[in-house]
């Protein structure tokens, strides 16, 4: 018969055995959880179950996976022990290399292939003025005839029939030739006069604003008073008029009419 101390040891060992087994089983379960500290440190992830909806597209996924493996050799699926950023770094470097080497050359080839053909610009045809078929040739005047015609034109721009007949006979010319020469000379004088007037306008343009001209002198007191209106019952003294270019309104309207 065993002593009481031995019985207590056996009893305690029997009680501690199941308790220790339960603790070990609990530790194993805790360590097997995917969000535990040990699982995160060891970076061991349990295989994820594919949903039922993705089962039909397994063939497409396989083809996409094979094509990716063919495009990027050596950059397969990330192992369980590889760092998280390894795949992204390799993919970035591979994409940069492909853009620099293949995409650049292909783009240049495409641009050279579809370049537009060079344009052959034809010179513009110069359109000449067509003269009449029955046009008379120009009269070749001599130097003495031209001097006599100019002297006569300065004296008188319009000749009578008798004067033209006498003058043409003295120069050995026809009346028609003298008549046409005087017509052309009057047109030339008119053009020269218009050019001189245009030069005078351009020279006097900085003195007055553009598009402005006064038909009367503005410094006259009577005409300056007429700007304020003489029909007003109480006449005001004449005020000094400011520069007209400061106002965009017409000169006939004043502040007293608008008030």
From Swiss-Prot:
Residues 1-29, 47-124 are annotated as: Disordered. It comes from the Eukaryota. Residues 134-193 bind DNA. Residues 90-108 have a biased composition (Polar residues). It is found in: Nucleus. The keyword DNA-binding applies. Residues 1-11 have a biased composition (Basic and acidic residues). PROSITE patterns: HOMEOBOX_1, HOMEOBOX_2. SUPFAM superfamilies: Homeodomain-like. Acts as a transcriptional regulator in bone development. Binds to DNA. Morphogenetic role. This is Homeobox protein MSX-2. The lineage of its organism: Eukaryota, Metazoa, Chordata, Craniata, Vertebrata. The gene is MSX2.
């Amino acid at each position: 018969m065993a002593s009481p101390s031995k019985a207590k040891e056996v009893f305690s060992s029997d009680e501690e055995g199941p308790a220790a087994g339960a603790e070990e089983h609990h530790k194993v379960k805790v360590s097997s959880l995917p969000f535990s500290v040990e699982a995160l440190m060891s970076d061991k992830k349990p295989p994820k179950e594919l949903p039922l909806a993705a089962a039909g597209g397994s063939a497409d996924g396989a083809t996409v996976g094979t094509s990716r493996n063919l495009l990027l050799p050596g950059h397969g699926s990330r192992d369980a022990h590889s760092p998280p950023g390894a795949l992204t770094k390799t993919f970035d470097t591979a994409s940069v290399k492909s853009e620099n080497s293949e995409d650049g050359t292909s783009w240049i080839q495409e641009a050279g292939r579809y370049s537009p053909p060079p344009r052959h610009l034809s010179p513009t045809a110069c359109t000449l003025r067509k003269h009449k078929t029955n046009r008379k040739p120009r009269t070749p005047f001599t130097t003495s005839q031209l001097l006599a015609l100019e002297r006569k034109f300065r004296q008188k721009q319009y000749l009578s029939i008798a004067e033209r007949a006498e003058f043409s006979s003295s120069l050995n010319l026809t009346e028609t030739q003298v008549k046409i020469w005087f017509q052309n000379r009057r047109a030339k004088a008119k053009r020269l006069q218009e050019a001189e007037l245009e030069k005078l306008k351009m020279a006097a343009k900085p003195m007055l604003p553009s598009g402005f001209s006064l038909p009367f002198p503005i410094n006259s007191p009577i005409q300056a008073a007429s700007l304020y209106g003489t029909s007003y019952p109480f006449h005001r003294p004449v005020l000094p008029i400011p520069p007209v270019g400061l106002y965009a309104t017409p000169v006939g309207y004043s502040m007293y009419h608008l008030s």
